[in-house]
Regions:
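Beta-strand-turn-beta hairpins that frame and shape the catalytic cleft
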Residues: 35-45, 143-157, 171-199, 351-354
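Bacterial N-terminal signal peptides
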Residues: 1-7
Length: 354
C-alpha cells in the first residue's frame, strides 16, 4: 500500500517515461572522424541488435538468468569486441537495436558514443524506447536504452516516431513499460541529398494487436518516405517470423516453466506487406528452401541460431539482386563468430548506389 501511494504521489516528471508522437532524436559525432568516401558504387548496411553490450551474460529476464547489472570491465569488454567486429566489417551505415545510453545495468556508458569513438563511423542518431529515471523493480534503477543509427556521413536530422503501446497492460505497468518507436535519420550522402536510414524494434509478444499495429505504422512511415521521393534503407528487430518458416513454436532455446514460450502461430502473414511493397534483403524463396541460413537469434548460444527476427528493406536495389546479403552467423557464413557477441546476429545488406 505504501508503494502504491508513493507511485500515485509521483507525477510523470519523477520517472520521465513519456514521449511525444514525434520528436527530435539525439545526434552524435565521433570524437575523431575518419575520411568518408565522396563517391561510391554501393553501400554496406549492417543491422544489429547488440543486447546493450550484454553479450552472453544471462540476465534475470532470460532463461536461467540471475544477473541484473554488469561490471565496467564486462561492459567495455563486450563493447570492444563488438567495435572490433564493426571495424573489420566496415559498414557504411550501421543500424542498431538495444543500445544503452545511460543505464545502471551497463554502468551508465553511452554506447552510441563508445562505438562511434572506436570504429570508422563518424555520426550517430539515438532515440530511447525505455527512459526511466528510476525503475523501482528488480534493481533496475536508472534506465535509458533504445535504437541508434551510425553513419560515415553526416546525419543532418533525425526523428523519433512513437509506435502504438500495449493497450492491454494496466495503466501503472504501461506507464513504466517500453515505448517503442521508429527512428528516422537523414544522411547527407555527397551524391544524394534525399537519403534516409530507418530503425525499429517491435514488440516481442503479440499482446492483442499491438505488434500488428506497430508493423502497420512502420510500413506507413516507409510508404510516406517513398511518396515524398526519398531513398531509404530500413532495418530492425521485428520480433516476427516470415512466411515460409518451418517452425513457429517449440524452439530449442525456449524456457518452458520459467517464461511464456515463444509462439508465432497466426502471425505468419503479418509482415507480408513489407515484403510485398519493398525490397527485402532476404529472398523469401531462398528462405523457404533454407530457413537456417537466415536465422538471426537464439536465447542460448549452445543451441545455435534458432529463428529469424531481424530484417533489412529498401525502396532501392540490392547489389547482385541480393546475392551478397546474409546473416553473419559464423566464420563460415559472414567471416565472424558472432554468436558470443549478442543474442542476435548481424544482418548484412549491400545497397546499389544509383
Amino acid at each position: 500500500m505504501i508503494g502504491l501511494l508513493l507511485f500515485i504521489a509521483c507525477d510523470q516528471t519523477t520517472f520521465r517515461t513519456n514521449f511525444d508522437e514525434e520528436e527530435p532524436a539525439i545526434l552524435y559525432q565521433a570524437e575523431t572522424k575518419t575520411d568518408a568516401p565522396q563517391t561510391a558504387e554501393q553501400l554496406l548496411v549492417i543491422n544489429y541488435n547488440i543486447k546493450y553490450g550484454g553479450a552472453r551474460l544471462s540476465f534475470f529476464w532470460e532463461c536461467d538468468g540471475e544477473r541484473y547489472n554488469m561490471t565496467v570491465e564486462e561492459v567495455t569488454g563486450h563493447l570492444d569486441a563488438i567495435a572490433e567486429f564493426i571495424t573489420d566489417a566496415d559498414p557504411d551505415i550501421l543500424i542498431l537495436q538495444e543500445v544503452d545510453r545511460s543505464s545502471l545495468r551497463s554502468n551508465y556508458i553511452d554506447q552510441t558514443q563508445y562505438l562511434l569513438d572506436r570504429t570508422n563511423l563518424n555520426y550517430g542518431a539515438y532515440a530511447s524506447q525505455h527512459s526511466v529515471d528510476f525503475l523501482p523493480t528488480d534493481g533496475m534503477g536508472h534506465v535509458d536504452f533504445g535504437n541508434a543509427i551510425l553513419s560515415k556521413w553526416p546525419i543532418s536530422e533525425a526523428t523519433r516516431i512513437s509506435l502504438p503501446l500495449v493497450e492491454s497492460y494496466p495503466a501503472y505497468y504501461k506507464y513504466l513499460y517500453l515505448k517503442r518507436h521508429v527512428l528516422t535519420a537523414k544522411i547527407d550522402l555527397p551524391w544524394n541529398d534525399h537519403f534516409y536510414a530507418i530503425d525499429t524494434h517491435l514488440e516481442a509478444f503479440s499482446e492483442g494487436n499491438t505488434k500488428l499495429d506497430q508493423i502497420t505504422k512502420f510500413h506507413s512511415v516507409l510508404t510516406d518516405l517513398s511518396a515524398e521521393g526519398m531513398d531509404w534503407v530500413a532495418a530492425g528487430d521485428l520480433n516476427s517470423l516470415p512466411k515460409g518458416s518451418d517452425n513457429l513454436k517449440d524452439f530449442p532455446d525456449d524456457c518452458p516453466g520459467m517464461f511464456d514460450v515463444d509462439d508465432y502461430s497466426g502471425e505468419e502473414d503479418w509482415i507480408d506487406p513489407l515484403f510485398n511493397d519493398f525490397n527485402s534483403a532476404m529472398n523469401l524463396t531462398e528462405y523457404a528452401a533454407d530457413n537456417e541460413a537466415w536465422y538471426s537469434y537464439t536465447g542460448k548460444a549452445e543451441e545455435g541460431w534458432s529463428r529469424t527476427l531481424d530484417y533489412v528493406f529498401t525502396n532501392g536495389t540490392w547489389v547482385n539482386d541480393g546475392a551478397d546479403n546474409m546473416v553473419m552467423q559464423s566464420v563460415e557464413q559472414g567471416g565472424y563468430e558472432t554468436i558470443y557477441l549478442s543474442d542476435h546476429a548481424p544482418v548484412q545488406a549491400i545497397l546499389e548506389v544509383e
